[in-house]
Amino acid sequence: MWLLLITSVISTFGGAHGLFGKLGPGNPEANMNISQMITYWGYPCQEYEVVTEDGYILGVYRIPHGKNNSENIGKRPVVYLQHGLIASATNWIANLPNNSLAFMLADAGYDVWLGNSRGNTWSRKNVYYSPDSVEFWAFSFDEMAKYDLPATINFIVQKTGQEKIHYVGHSQGTTIGFIAFSTNPTLAKKIKTFYALAPVATVKYTQSPLKKISFIPTFLFKLMFGKKMFLPHTYFDDFLGTEVCSREVLDLLCSNTLFIFCGFDKKNLNVSRFDVYLGHNPAGTSVQDFLHWAQLVRSGKFQAFNWGSPSQNMLHYNQKTPPEYDVSAMTVPVAVWNGGNDILADPQDVAMLLPKLSNLLFHKEILAYNHLDFIWAMDAPQEVYNEMISMMAED
């Protein structure tokens, strides 16, 4: 409702009286696709489609080298970046090159690959089902871990000729990593080190308003949002980024709305990039994926999706209740960064996770950081990225 009010005020007074002046000229990347965003800054880009075992067609993007190190044609160490919930590969390239992890890695000599989970803007195709069908959207992060990660990682290993790669996950990108690398030993052997940013397994202590949404009964949630896509990107999101949140008077309102869901850290948000952030987010997922997270909030457990009845769970798991994931079974070396001000990956949940990581190499809690600071914070290079790149160089 407040958004409708704001847009009405802008339409009425903004043009006629010069009120609500923009913070600056718009950023062209707000209206670009992933390949265009990469090449806009002078980096090379390759685009691939990876087909999963169950037929989903995933958009995968590659930055094979940096702007100034193309002369070294030998094999480069490979890094795979996996985004979080309702997000996409654009998260890793949304800031300026010296502030975006994907570009920094490419300039540091790495072969950088960007993944997209099924159902988001860049992975909304299937060999068998149309995105208009309910069947297409019958997935959660279970399937991303079981099918998306193996398909993408195996493709990268085959394409590059590298036996092992570095894996960087943010938010749900860590979740599917924990599942895949603890349940699929063959896949786990292909990972050098797992770099987990704002890691999420249990969400027992999350303080985000999403916690309250999680207690909406499933039947009512489906009545409100349907059974297919959840929070897809729309033209209204673009409008918010270019015409609302880019206004001097309103950027604070937009940033505070973001902070309510992810935790507050005002000084680290580059409001001049709002149009890029909102030009590509949210990128969508399935209603089932969100319901899976709601289930974890209510149960306090890190478990597979509950299909709604003992008989349905028996069909999927051969047991009446969804099985819990055993993170301690993962032997991949892992480095963890979490935020003390993160209300999605709450520090208490992270504290429960850390003892279960049998091969924990490194842990750092950044007290001021919220959930999104790991991908967008202005000081992310100093707090996280430079440290990570140094660790990769020693691996």
Swiss-Prot record:
SUPFAM superfamilies documented for this protein: alpha/beta-Hydrolases (SSF53474)
EC number: 3.1.1.3
Tissues expressing this chain: Secreted by the serous (von Ebner's) glands at the back of the rat tongue.
InterPro entries the UniProt entry points to: AB_hydrolase_fold, AB_hydrolase_lipase, Lipase_euk
Glycan-linked positions: 33, 68, 98, 270
UniProt-listed Gene3D superfamilies: alpha/beta hydrolase (3.40.50.1820)
Gene Ontology terms, MF aspect: lipase activity; malate dehydrogenase activity; triacylglycerol lipase activity
Listed GO biological process terms: lipid catabolic process; malate metabolic process
Chain ranges of the AB hydrolase-1 domain: 77-376
Pfam families: Abhydro_lipase
Active site: 171 (nucleophile), 342 (charge relay system), 371 (charge relay system)
Disulphide connectivity of cysteines: 245-254
Predominant place of localization: secreted
Keywords: Disulfide bond, Glycoprotein, Hydrolase, Lipid degradation, Lipid metabolism, Secreted, Signal
Subcellular location: Secreted
Reactions accelerated catalytically: a triacylglycerol + H2O = a diacylglycerol + a fatty acid + H(+); 1,2,3-tri-(9Z-octadecenoyl)-glycerol + H2O = 1,2-di-(9Z-octadecenoyl)-sn-glycerol + (9Z)-octadecenoate + H(+); 1,2,3-trioctanoylglycerol + H2O = 1,2-dioctanoyl-sn-glycerol + octanoate + H(+)
Keyword Ion transport appears in the UniProt entry: no
Signal peptide range: 1-18
Nucleus found in the keyword field: no
UniProt similarity note: Belongs to the AB hydrolase superfamily. Lipase family.
Function: Catalyzes the hydrolysis of triacylglycerols to yield free fatty acids, diacylglycerol, monoacylglycerol, and glycerol. Shows a preferential hydrolysis at the sn-3 position of triacylglycerol.
Annotated PANTHER family: LYSOSOMAL ACID LIPASE-RELATED
Annotated protein name in UniProt: Gastric triacylglycerol lipase
The encoding gene: Lipf
